[in-house]
Regions:
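Conserved C-terminal RecA-like helicase domain
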Residues: 1-155
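Alpha-helix capping/helix-boundary segments
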Residues: 161-163
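A general structural signal for stabilizing positions within well-ordered secondary structure
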Residues: 147, 165-166
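Short beta-strand and adjacent tight-turn residues that come in two discontinuous sequence segments
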Residues: 158
Length: 166
């Protein structure tokens, strides 16, 4: 058995070691199958908590160029802020928010309640819009965090770099 472990680079210094190679690690991190799991978890939590749901999903990738997939039936082939948002939006009836340094997506109905100066671009075939705010990221994070804590957003998807520290 040890020879097999050594041959497969799993046995080092008399210990079994399951360190992942960079290419395998990237494949696991970007696995599209995770989208289905995220949707299942969100569905289960929403079924249990209803409007009391407060789910935070942190990820590393934004992929703003994937915004054109929102509101379509196109397949989602990578895992990032936009595809996580769209996977949940397609299958679970919850209010979702997205926040990163370069992208904020919120339900349209929140526009009238946001007092902070903003502009928005409606996303076709959805009840969501891309919001733009003047000022720094701290202002956006405070606003979206407040909406989340008040329950106006049930699921918040953000980048680790922006939300993970706060």
């Amino acid at each position: 058995i040890i020879k097999i472990l050594i041959k497969n680079n799993i046995y080092e210094n008399k210990k079994v070691c399951f360190s992942l190679k960079d290419n395998l690690k990237r494949k696991l991190i970007s696995s599209v199958g995770k989208l289905d799991s995220i949707v299942k978890i969100t569905t289960c939590e929403y079924d249990s908590l209803k409007s009391n749901l407060r789910e935070l999903i942190l990820t590393d990738y934004i992929r703003k160029e994937n915004v054109n997939l929102i509101g379509t039936n196109e397949s989602l082939t990578s895992i990032n802020i936009v595809t996580i948002f769209e996977s949940i939006r397609r299958k679970v009836n919850v209010n979702i928010g997205v926040i990163s340094g370069s992208l904020v997506i919120l339900p349209l109905f929140l526009s009238s309640t946001i007092t902070l100066k903003h502009s928005l671009k409606k996303i076709e075939n959805t009840d969501y819009a891309i919001f733009s705010f003047s000022g720094d990221n701290k202002i956006k994070v405070e606003l979206v965090s407040k909406l989340f804590s008040e329950g106006r957003i049930n699921v918040l998807i953000g980048t680790k770099s922006l939300l993970g520290e706060g």
